[in-house]
Structure formats: structure tokens, C-alpha cells
A protein has these predicted regions:
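Long, solvent-exposed, polar/charged low-complexity segments
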Residues: 1-15, 38-44, 151-199
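Hydrophobic/aromatic-rich structural module bridging two neighboring secondary-structure elements via a short loop
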Residues: 52-96
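Active-site acidic/histidine clusters and adjacent loop/turn architecture
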Residues: 14-67
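A short, structural micro-pattern
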Residues: 80-82, 97, 106-110, 172-174
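Compact, glycine/acidic-enriched structural inserts
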Residues: 105-164
Length: 199
């Protein structure tokens, strides 16, 4: 059961940023396990259980990121990630090309929401065709999003607009990838079991 992250979690992430090398990590591996790895896995398990209870007709696939970077893709970075996250999606076979719920913690902040990590061009073309065929469901969602202040629409835009369905839907229509994100500074919620319910 998730009981909250701690100041030690944030301290570990900052220290890792400045000491991103194997000897330092091995010396601090127990700190990683106690303050970041186990709490992240507990939070992911609790959120998964809540989703399974709320939507028993769906199969949820949980992925908790590993701290280790892919050695083939270091590109001058250290061997360890300075942020950790988990994702939950309904279809594991299509990987990052379908939307997922996510939570991420970094040395600076934490975020959660739903969206694409990466979407194929034809996936977004299907999304635009769905908007063209029936804009009302997305119009209702866009209006609800604009009426609240927790989540914002983010994601990379296409260099050239793909069309203009009107001012309300234009930001959605012209995204290369999109997500609805809540980004927060490290606050009391992060250090509390109540984070599970917030997610």
C-alpha cells in the first residue's frame, strides 16, 4: 500500500542528477529501493487496483519504468534515469502508440494525466477523421477541460496545420501527439497516501 513519497525521494533524484555513475548508484542502491522504487511500485499497484475496480470489463496493463537507461541510447547521459514513471493502458500489444494513463516524478516536480508518448501519423489521422465525422464528443470534452484548472492540453503541434475545425477544437486537431497533463511542484499531496485517490 502506498504511503507517500518522502523528502529522501527528492534528495535521491537530485543527487542522482549530479552523481549519475555506477559506483555512486551502487553505494546508494538501498536508498533508491526504499525511497523511490518501492513507493513507485506501491502507487502503481494501488492505482491499477482502483482502475480495475472502476472498470472491471477492461484489462489493464501496467508498466513501471526501470531506473536503468538503455545502454545503446546513452548519448552522453549517465546510465540512470533522473525521473521515474509508470503507465497504464488497455492494450499492451500496441505499446506507446495508444493513449495511456501515467504518473511521473522528477527532481523538479511530478505530473500525471493521460495521453500519447508517441503516436503514429495514421493514428492521429484517424483521430482527425473522427473529429470531422462527429465533433460533438470532443467539443464537450474541450469545454469541460477549459472549465477546470487541473489538467491542460499539451503535446507537440504539427509544423503546418492539418485543418481548422474551429477555435475550440483547433488545438486538438493539430497535435502530432497530445496529452492531458497536470504538472505540480513537490507538495504535501506527493508525500501522502491521498495521491492514489488524486490519480
Amino acid at each position: 500500500m502506498f504511503t507517500g513519497f518522502s523528502d529522501a525521494t527528492i534528495d535521491f533524484l537530485w543527487e542522482l542528477r549530479f552523481h549519475n555513475e555506477r559506483p555512486w548508484f551502487l553505494e546508494h542502491k538501498q536508498v533508491f529501493l526504499d525511497t523511490l522504487d518501492r513507493p513507485m511500485k506501491a502507487l502503481a499497484a494501488d492505482v491499477t487496483a482502483a482502475l480495475e475496480q472502476a472498470h472491471p470489463d477492461r484489462k489493464w496493463y501496467l508498466h513501471v519504468a526501470r531506473i536503468y537507461r538503455d545502454a545503446r541510447r546513452l548519448h552522453g547521459n549517465g546510465p540512470y534515469k533522473e525521473n521515474l514513471w509508470f503507465t497504464l493502458r488497455c492494450d499492451s500489444s500496441r505499446g506507446p502508440e495508444i493513449p495511456a494513463f501515467y504518473f511521473e516524478i522528477t527532481p523538479h516536480n511530478y505530473s500525471y494525466g493521460m495521453g500519447f508518448y508517441w503516436a503514429k501519423a495514421n493514428t492521429m489521422a484517424c483521430f482527425r477523421r473522427a473529429i470531422d465525422a462527429d465533433p460533438l464528443p470532443l467539443t464537450a470534452l474541450a469545454e469541460r477541460l477549459n472549465a477546470q484548472d487541473t489538467f491542460v492540453l499539451t503535446g507537440q503541434d504539427y509544423a503546418r496545420a492539418k485543418g481548422d475545425p474551429g477555435a475550440l477544437l483547433r488545438p486538438w486537431y493539430n497535435k502530432r501527439v497530445l496529452d492531458l497533463s497536470c504538472v505540480r511542484e513537490h507538495d504535501d499531496l506527493l508525500f501522502s497516501p491521498a495521491l492514489t485517490d488524486a490519480l
